[in-house]
Amino acid sequence: MPLNEPSSNAFPRTVLFDLDGTLLDSAPDMLATANAMLAARGRAPITLAQLRPVISIGTFRILAVAFPELDAAAIQGLIPEFLQRYEALIGSVSKPFDGVEMMLDALECAGTVWGIVTNKPEFLARLILPLLGWTSRCAVLIGGDTLAERKPHPLPLLTAAERIGVMPTDCVYVGDDVSDIQAARAAGMPSMVALWGYRSHEDNPMTWQADTLVEQPHLLSRPDVWPST
């Protein structure tokens, strides 16, 4: 899919990223967690192909794929077990997408400040940062339970910008799900769709009204790809 026409020849002052499906390929750890729960119940495992399209949506949808026969209340009741098992496995298989480290290095060399705004529980996201060597590099981390609202509400993005000390219009938000783009638009923040992320076949990012679509992380090492801020 072609990129939208870029409108800037400079890196943004600040970049905020989604985590799962944007910076981190966390699908293997989440698959291992779901399959451990299934094995504990004598059930057959699910596949990565089944799980990938729903990872950006959240734990509830992951469990709905693993346990399709359960109603919403029963699935909700499994979430604490999933989070406990996932905490034990976190970072064991997951790694940044190819090109992410190159991109982050390029941003930092240009003086760009970057942070993470994710719907993953904050304590889990914070466990990941030291495993990747990102603790001192990430200027702000907002999780799905950090505030009273989560994406697609704009509050997490607005709070991240405030904590860094910049205006929302000085930031670009990069994510792989429609809720990421909705949050950015509501916050008045330029946005980019990470096309390498966890989209389902039914998703059409061309309809999300992002400023830019980008195919691979390494392309974000180029200043001309970024939308203007």
From Swiss-Prot:
Q: Which cofactor does it need?
A: Mg(2+)
Gene3D superfamilies for this protein: HAD superfamily/HAD-like, Putative phosphatase, domain 2
UniProt keywords (A-Z) are:
Carbohydrate metabolism, Hydrolase, Magnesium, Metal-binding
InterPro entries in UniProt: HAD-like_hydrolase_sf, HAD-like_sf, HAD-SF_hydro_IA, HAD_2, HAD_sf, PGP-like_dom2, PGPase_prok
Reaction(s) catalysed by this chain's protein: 2-phosphoglycolate + H2O = glycolate + phosphate
Q: Which domain of life is it from?
A: Bacteria
According to its UniProt record, the EC number is 3.1.3.18
Recorded GO cellular component terms are:
cytosol
Which residues take part in binding Mg(2+)? 18, 20, 176
| One BP annotation, GO | glycolate biosynthetic process
Q: Which NCBIfam families match?
A: HAD-SF-IA-v1, HAD-SF-IA-v3, PGP_bact, PRK13226.1
State its role. Specifically catalyzes the dephosphorylation of 2-phosphoglycolate. Is involved in the dissimilation of the intracellular 2-phosphoglycolate formed during the DNA repair of 3'-phosphoglycolate ends, a major class of DNA lesions induced by oxidative stress.
Task: Return the HAMAP family for the record.
Answer: GPH_hydrolase_bact
Q: Indicate the family of this protein.
A: Belongs to the HAD-like hydrolase superfamily. CbbY/CbbZ/Gph/YieH family.
Q: What is this protein called?
A: Phosphoglycolate phosphatase
Species name for this entry? Xylella fastidiosa (strain 9a5c)
